[in-house]
């Protein structure tokens, strides 16, 4: 299997998800890499449908162990035609809970065939100098791992007879997806935090 184009579709309020997705794409080494930033609502334009010759990276941070509600509707509009895909979640050094499973399910529902899936650590959006959480991540080692992950995917696809043969049958996570007991309290508290990442101007 040869991949002509890698399209990275990413939601990245703090920029770290974008960086990790880009390094994965570099590792895959396709002739063309397209970066689609869907962080701001104004940038969420129709994208696709994608073909079998494409490879799509879907990348997002983890909020409360889930995919951010903000980006769920847009990801659900993406359509593949048996297109290989790589769901990627980025979390702040605690747990990613059911986020990877949720993103995997979104991809499958959209006609994509996940050939790999990854979870990477980045500095938490609530990290402060007084209370650092995964400070300065991803670091050089993290980025090397992300690029190596992409290289491994390229090698896997090169020896696979078909997309179906390369497709993952499952990823870590559960259904129904986790619902934090204090989710509403968290959302209310988050509104008052000045360093909460913005997703639009």
Question: Where are each of the predicted segments found?
Answer:
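FMN-binding flavodoxin-like domain, especially the glycine-rich phosphate-binding loop
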Residues: 1-7, 14-41, 46-197
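Iron-sulfur cluster-binding cysteine motifs and their immediate structural context
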Residues: 200-201
């Amino acid at each position: 299997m040869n991949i002509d184009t890698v399209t990275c579709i990413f939601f990245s309020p703090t920029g770290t998800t974008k960086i990790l997705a880009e390094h994965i794409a570099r590792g895959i080494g396709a002739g063309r890499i397209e970066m689609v930033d869907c962080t701001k609502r104004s940038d969420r334009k129709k994208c696709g449908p994608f073909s079998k010759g494409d490879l799509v990276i879907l990348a997002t941070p983890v909020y409360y162990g889930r995919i951010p509600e903000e980006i769920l509707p847009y990801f659900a509009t993406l359509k593949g035609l048996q297109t290989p895909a790589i769901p990627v979640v980025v979390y702040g050094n605690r747990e990613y809970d059911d986020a990877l499973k949720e993103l995997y399910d979104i991809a499958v529902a959209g006609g994509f065939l996940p050939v790999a899936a990854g979870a990477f650590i980045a500095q938490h959006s609530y990290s402060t100098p007084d209370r650092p959480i995964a400070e300065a991540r991803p670091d050089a080692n993290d980025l090397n791992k992300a690029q190596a992950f992409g290289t491994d995917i390229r090698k896997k696809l090169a020896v696979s007879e078909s997309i179906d043969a390369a497709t993952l049958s499952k990823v870590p996570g559960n259904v129904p997806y986790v619902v934090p007991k204090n989710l509403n309290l968290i959302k209310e508290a988050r509104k008052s935090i000045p360093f909460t990442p913005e997703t639009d101007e």
